[in-house]
Amino acid sequence: MTNSLFRQSFLSDTLNMQQSVEAKATTLSNGVRLQLHQRGVLEVIPANNSAETKNIILSSGIHGDETAPMELIDKIVHDIETGFQDVQARCLFIIAHPEATNAHTRFIEENLNRLFDEKEHQPSKELVIADQLKLLVKAFFDNTPVESRWHLDLHCAIRASKHYSFAISPKTRHPTRSKALVDFVNHSHVEALLLSNSPSSTFSWFSAEYYSAQALTMELGRVARIGENELERFTALDLTMRDLIAEVTPEHLPKPAITYRVSRTIVRLHQDFDFRFDDQVENFTSFMHGEVFGHDGDKPLMAKNDNEAIVFPNRNVAIGQRAALMVCEVKARFEDDQLVYD
């Protein structure tokens, strides 16, 4: 058996900040090549790499305390190393922010998932990470066919949700809502798919906007510590990710996700800002048309559509940052291989 790249495992070595991590590589007996570029960044290259090969980024840990995705990725990497997991796609596995993970917090100085646009940002530990990740994405996707590029950025939600798992499709200038991507969501038994209506500054948006990748931010359950995640609830997702890496069609039946459009983004404009509900309210809690659910300065925050629902409410964001998304359920269809709605 080939010597492992890791002292313990991809995840354990990434989080062990007492040990240095050196760039190194190995080739397995099946011809699959593993290249550890830096702490938390592993490239896996199939034996038969070609122009037809998918190029897939599977990222986790953009928020340090969202650990379920790290555990899922770690198990896949382990099974690749042992030869149990077939590899036909070129993959980049990322555990992004081990310092925050070890501190059991989302971030140290700045929300990393707000730093992937081209705006000027204040210096921070997270800005250094964002800049490194941008370079890694560029290097990974350079000289690859556009249609081969995928990016699944895996997260967990802070609060409970009426949908235990959901995915967000970023809004870009490119055709990044393919039927293949939606089929992946449905086979993963992800309960809801949100279609963003404006550009953002997230990691998945960056890959979709600048590299035309089929990209999603995927929210998997709630934040928990390593070893305390309900990974059995993500069996369908795990199988579907593994099938994607092996480039085979899933054998299990899909479950169509409920599709939502983002109707608007609530941005905090004033110091005097609050919601009328407590922090226990679930994502996708809906309101009647005209129902007031908060205020921003002297302006009431109210539902502008019947059954308009709130996602990611956060009363504590800084002025100028997103305080919530408002979403409405839609009937979607495919047009020229792209998911659209009327």
Swiss-Prot record:
Pathway: Amino-acid degradation; L-arginine degradation via AST pathway; L-glutamate and succinate from L-arginine: step 5/5
Cofactor list: Zn(2+)
GO BP terms, alphabetized: arginine catabolic process to glutamate; arginine catabolic process to succinate
Keywords: Arginine metabolism, Hydrolase, Metal-binding, Zinc
Catalytic residues identified in the record: E219
Catalytic reaction equation(s): N-succinyl-L-glutamate + H2O = L-glutamate + succinate
Cofactor annotation remark: Binds 1 zinc ion per subunit.
Disulfide bonds: none
Residues binding Zn(2+): H63, E66, H155
NCBIfam families tied to this protein: PRK05324.1
Name of the protein in question: Succinylglutamate desuccinylase
Species name: Vibrio vulnificus (strain CMCP6)
Gene name for this UniProt entry: astE
